[in-house]
């Protein structure tokens, strides 16, 4: 199985090999290489970080830099893609929102923290991390319960996490959803993720929810087709008690994600009738495909009549 190199990589890195007006080759310095590689690896399709890293390694021709910076590159990819981490008794998304310090993450459901090796994809050094704000934890737990029910009903393999950040005047709740399908054997990979944030103050009767929904897909059998869609959402959420607000929030997320999915399906339908039309053979004047089964059946009937 072959896979195309990362789009635009060779063009950008070719700058280091093209002669300048003075006849000399201006090489990229280390910092420039790190910046270029980091930017391109952030665009790596879901489930293809290792392949993109190998492509870039061959183009950069600086193994020392690549392997020294690999943990940092991988950490960015892990957090950007809301990578799920599953251990014996818990499952949590790895994001920038629950990174307590470099490479140490919090699982609010299990109330533990752990170190994570992004290259080996292994958690270690588990430590108890109880939530001190009991009132805030009640909001977070109810939100997680409603969101988990939504994810279980709408995703074949989905994961969600809810995090809380306390400030002097308000609580900030962040909810993340991730679902991926990696089918390299069938030449495609895909990811759906969304992130939702809103704040609560003691006198809150409503709050503004901001969300971002991202869909990525890559199909690479005899070609190289990328899909990358991001939709931003802003909605008002009524704040009552913890349980009701959590249920209303889950309904808000469901409505927004359904709109994105339906919009994508409508775009595919339009593309099928417009952009993709030129790639197909023309239909007969009836604008219907031939019913070969009906034709074959008719010939069998005719043959029997003759006999």
Segments and roles (model prediction):
Residues 8, 12-160, 167-169, 262-265, ...:
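A structural "domain/chain start" motif
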Residues 137, 141, 145, 149, ...:
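Surface-exposed short loop/turn segments
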Residues 1-2, 10:
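Generic signature of intrinsically disordered, low-complexity, basic-rich segments
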């Amino acid at each position: 199985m072959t896979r195309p190199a990362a789009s635009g990589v060779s063009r950008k890195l070719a700058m280091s090999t093209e002669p300048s007006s003075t006849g000399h080759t201006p090489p990229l310095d280390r910092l420039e290489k790190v910046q270029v590689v980091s930017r391109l690896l952030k665009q790596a399709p879901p489930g293809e970080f290792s392949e993109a890293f190998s492509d870039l390694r061959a183009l950069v021709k600086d193994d020392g830099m690549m392997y020294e910076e690999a943990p940092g590159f991988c950490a960015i990819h892990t957090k950007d893609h809301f990578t799920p981490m599953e251990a014996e008794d818990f499952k949590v998304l790895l994001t920038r929102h629950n990174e307590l310090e470099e490479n140490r993450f919090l699982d609010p459901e299990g109330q533990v923290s752990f170190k994570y090796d992004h290259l080996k994809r292994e958690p270690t050094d588990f430590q108890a991390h109880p939530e001190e704000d009991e009132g805030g934890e009640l909001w977070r737990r109810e939100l997680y319960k409603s969101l988990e029910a939504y994810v279980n009903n709408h995703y074949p393999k989905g994961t969600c996490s809810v995090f809380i950040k306390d400030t002097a005047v308000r609580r900030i709740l962040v909810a993340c959803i991730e679902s991926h399908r990696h089918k390299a054997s069938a030449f495609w990979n895909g990811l759906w993720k969304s992130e939702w944030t809103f704040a609560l103050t003691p006198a809150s009767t409503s709050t503004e929810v901001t969300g971002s929904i991202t869909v990525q897909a890559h199909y690479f059998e005899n070609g190289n087709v990328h899909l990358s869609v991001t939709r931003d959402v802003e909605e008002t959420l009524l704040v009552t008690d913890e349980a009701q607000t959590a249920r209303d929030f889950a309904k808000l997320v469901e409505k927004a994600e359904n709109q994105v999915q339906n919009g994508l399906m409508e775009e595919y339908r339009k593309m099928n009738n417009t952009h993709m039309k030129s790639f197909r053979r023309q239909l007969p004047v009836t604008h219907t495909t031939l019913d070969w089964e009906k034709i074959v059946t008719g010939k069998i009937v005719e043959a029997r009549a003759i006999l």
